[in-house]
Amino acid sequence: MMRMAAMLFYMMVFATICSSSSSMAITREQEEDRIRELPGQPRVGFSQFSGYVSVNKKHGRALFYWLTQSPSSPNNKPLLLWLNGGPGCSSVAYGASEEIGPFRINKTGSSLYLNRFAWNTEANILFLESPAGVGFSYTNTSSDLLTSGDNRTAQDALIFLVKWMSRFPQYKYRDFYIAGESYAGT
C-alpha cells in the first residue's frame, strides 16, 4: 500500500512538472540524440532518437532511452513509455527487438527488417532501460547494483521522465501511457 501511495505521489509531481509550456521545434539536444540510421536498417518514414539521461550525478547513474516516433502523424500520436520486466530485462534488447519495436533482426544478425506489428504505428514509443545496470543504462558506483530496488528504480524513472520531458517538451501535453510486461507492473 505504501509503494502505491509513493508511486501516486511521484506521478502527481510528474504531471505538475509537465504542465509547463511546450515547444514543437526540434532542440539542439534532440538533434544530438537523433539516430540517422541503424546498421543494416531498411528505409523508414519515422524519426528515432536515443541517448542517456543522468538521474544521479553523485553516483554517475544514467538511464538509456530509445524513442521511435510514429510514421504517420507523430505530432498527434500519444507517447507510450515501455518498460520490460525482470527486473533486469532490457527494453531495447527484448521489448524493442523481439516484441513491439519497429525492427526485427534477421537470422544472421547482419541486418534489420520492419516489424509489421510494431506499436509505433499507433504511438510514439519510448523504450527505457531501467534500472541502472540493465541494458545500456549504467552507474559508476558499483554498490548501486547491489542496493537497487523498487523505490530507487521508481525515483530514477521519475527523474528520467522529468529531464526527458525537458529535452522533448513537445510531448508534455500528449496523452501519456505506461506499458510493460511481467515485473514492469511493479
What are these regions (language model features)?
Residues 30-32, 125-128, 158-162:
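Short, functional N-terminal and low-complexity linear motifs
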Residues 5, 66-155, 166:
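N-terminal cap/lid subdomain of alpha/beta-hydrolase-fold enzymes
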Residues 57-61, 146-158, 183-186:
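Phosphate/oxyanion-binding active-site loops and adjacent basic polyanion-contact surfaces
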